[in-house]
Amino acid sequence: MLEAWMPKSGKPSTGTTPADFAPTQWNIIYLLMTVGSLVAALSISIQPLLLDKIFGIAFEKEGAVNADIQVVAEIVSIVCVGWFGLLSDRIGRVRIIATGFLIAVAGAAMSLLSLQIGLAFGAAGLVLFYLTRVLLTVGADTVQLQLSTLVGDVSSRANRPRLMGNLVFMMVFGGTMLSAIIMQMADYKGGVFIIMCLPLLIGIAGFQMTRESLRDVAQPQQAPTGDEHPLRQVWSVITSDPRLQLAFAAAFYTRADVIILSLFFSLWCISVSDLVGVTRTYATAHAAVMIGLLGLAVLAAIPLWRSFIERHSRISAIGASLSLAAVGYIWLGMFANPFNWLVALPLLMVGIGHAGCFVTLQVLTVDVSPKPILGAMVGAGYLVGGLGTVMLVQSGGYYFDALGPRAPFILMGTGKMLVTLYAAWLLANGIDETCDHHLKSTRKVDWKPLVFLTAALPFVWLIGRSVIEGYFSNGSLGEAPVGFVNRYLGDWAFTFLIISLSMRPVQEITGIKSLAKYRRMIGLFAFFYAVLHVLAYVTLEWALNLGDMASDIYKRPFILLGLAAFLLLIPLAFTSTNSQIKKIGGKRWKRLHRATYVINALVALHFILAANHENGEPYVYAAAVIVLLWYRFYQWRGGNVLRALRIG
C-alpha cells in the first residue's frame, strides 16, 4: 500500500550517505517538524472550546470528556505509531512520514464534518470527533517520530546534540509559539473555522513536500527471523543500560508536558472566564498566549541544555531538568487565577525543564541505540511516553472535575519528583557517565522497583490529595466526591487487568521471556485497585447500609457484573504465590487462572453500562479485551497467531 506514495527523489532501498544529505533536506525536515507539531498542538488547543461551544458538554463533565478523548487518541496512536516505528526500519522513514501526513489529512477533513454535525445536533457529533482526534494524533505523532528517527540516522555522536537540539527547537516553535499566534484567531468571527482548516492544508502540503524533497539515509533492514525480533533486541538494549531505563522513565512524564498544559490550562481559563468577566474565546486565546510563553522558555533553554549535555553526564541533566519542571508544576498549582500574569513564572520553569529533559532523551536514545533497530528504539520511547500520557491525562481529567482545575499540575509535579529521586539513586550508587559519555559502571538495575512505583502512582496521588484536603482529620475526602473516587479506582483496576492480560501475548510475540516476572505484580495491583473500588462503594458511598446498596443495585443492575468479576478475582489473587502454585498443582492452577478471561469480559461490559454517553473510553477498553480474548481463543484452536502478528 505504501508503494503508491514512494518519494520521488529516491528509493529507500538505495539509501543516501550522511555526507550527501543536502542542506535543503535539513530545511525541509525542520519545516515538516514545525508543521507536524503545529497540527498536533492546534487539535489539542481547540478541543476544549469545541466541546464547550459546539458540542455543548456540561461544565462538570468537561475535564473528564476532554481527558477521555485524549486518552482514546493516545491509546490508538501508541499502537499505530509503534508499529510504524518497527516498519520504518525495513521500508524507510520517508514513506512512513508521507503516510502520517495523509492520515492527518483524513482527520482534518473529518473534523470539518464533525463541526457541522456538532452545530446541528450538539453532542451527537462526538463520535465523529473522537475519530477525528484519533487520526490527527496518529498522523502528527507519526510525522514527528519518524523525522526524529531520520535525523538520528544521519547524525553522529559529535553533531547529534546540535542536530537534535535544532529539531526539538523547531518542534517546540511549531507546537507552542506558532500555535499560540494562530489560536488568537479564535476570538474573531470565523476564526475557529480557519483554525480547523489549517491542519487539512498543512497535511496536503506536507505530504507533497515529503514525496518531492526527502530521501532516506539508513539502509533498510531485513525482516527479523528467529531470535532477531526487533522488540526483543529493544528489550535487551534497555535492560542492559541504566541510562536508558532512566530515560524511558523520564519519557513517561516528559511527553505529556505540552498536552497536559495545553489541555488543562485552557480548560482552567475557560472554567473561570465567567467569574473574571471575559468570553470563553478570549480565555482560549489567553491560554494559547501563556503556552506560547512556555514555548519561548523551551526555545531559549535548548541551546543551554545542548551545551550542558555535550560536557556533562546525561543522568545529571535528566535529574536537573525534571526537578526544575516539577517545582514549576507545583508552583503553578498554587495559583488561584489563571489570568494572573505571574503564572508565567512557573510556566517558564516548566518550559526550561522540559527543554533539558526532551533534548537529553532524544540524544541519549539515538546514541545508545544500535543502528539496525533505531526506529524500534525511538518507537519504544514513544510507547512509554504514550502510556504516561494516557495515565496522566486520565487521572488529570478526574482530578480536574472532582478536585479543581489546578489538581492536574500537582499530579505532574509529584510524578516528576519521583523520577528525579530515581536519578539521584543512580548517581548515589555510582551509576554515572564519564566525560566521553560512557558508563562508569556495568551494574544492571532491576526494573521491579520502578514497575512497582509506577503501578502504585494512582494510589499515591489519591492518598496525597486526600491528605491535602483533610480526609484523615475530618473523615471525608475533602473536595473529592465519592463518585470520583469510585470511578477513579475502578478505571485503574480495569487498566491493570488489561495490562496483565496483554503481557502473555506480548511475551509470545516478541520472545521477551523476562516479562513473565512482572505479570504477577501487575495482576496483584489490579486486585488491589479492585478491592479499593469495592470498599469505596460499600463504605464511602453507602456507609455499609445494605438496604440502600440493594436498592442501588436494583436500579443499576450492571453493578452485579462488577461484583461477579470481583468475586472471581479473589481466588486468583490468593493463589498467585509460588507456594500456592505448588500446593494446587500447575495444571489445576492454570485452569483456575483462565477465569481472568471471564473477568475481563465482565468488567468491560460493566464499564460500558456504567459510563455516560459522551465517554468513548469504555469502548476502546472493550475493543482491547476483545482482541486479547480473540488471541487466546485462536491459540487454543491451534492457529498460528505468532506468524500472523510478527513484524515481517
From Swiss-Prot:
GO terms for cellular component: magnetosome membrane; plasma membrane. Residues 1-431 are annotated as: Major facilitator domain. The keyword Transmembrane applies. Disruption phenotype: Slightly reduced magnetic response, produces chains of wild-type magnetite crystals sandwiched between irregularly shaped, small flake-like crystals. The flake-like crystals are hematite not magnetite. Phenotype is exacerbated when grown in NH(4)(+) instead of NO(3)(-) medium. Double mamH-mamZ deletion cells have a poor magnetic response and very few wild-type crystals; most cells have flake-like crystals. Induction: Expressed in exponential phase, peaks about 18 hours. The most highly expressed gene in this operon. Protein is associated with magnetosomes at mid-development then decreases (at protein level). Third gene in the 4 gene mamXY operon. The keyword Iron applies. It is found in: Magnetosome membrane. The chain crosses the membrane at residues 28-49, 69-87, 94-113, 119-143, 163-182, 188-207, 252-273, 285-305, 317-335, 341-361, 373-395, 407-428, 449-468, 488-506, 518-538, 558-574, 595-612, 618-634. Residues 444-645 are annotated as: Ferric reductase-like domain, required for correct magnetite crystal formation. Keywords: Biomineralization, Ion transport, Iron, Iron transport, Magnetosome, Membrane, Transmembrane, Transmembrane helix, Transport. PROSITE patterns: MFS (PS50850). GO terms for molecular function: electron transfer activity; FMN binding; heme binding; oxidoreductase activity, acting on diphenols and related substances as donors; transmembrane transporter activity. GO terms for biological process: iron ion transport; protein repair. InterPro entries: Fe3_Rdtase_TM_dom, MFS, MFS_dom, MFS_trans_sf, MsrQ-like. It is a multi-pass membrane protein. It holds the Pfam family MFS_1. This bacteria makes up to 60 cubo-octahedral magnetosomes of about 45 nm in diameter which contain membrane-bound crystals of magnetite (Fe(3)O(4)). Probably interacts with FtsZ-like and MamY proteins. In the N-terminal section; belongs to the major facilitator superfamily. Required for correct biomineralization of the magnetosome; probably converts and then transports some form of iron. It is partially functionally redundant with MamH. May function with MamX, MamY amd Mms6 in biomineralization. Despite its strong similarity to MsrQ (AC V6EX82) this protein does not genetically interact with bona fide MsrP (AC V6F0A4), which is encoded elsewhere in the genome. This is Magnetosome protein MamZ.
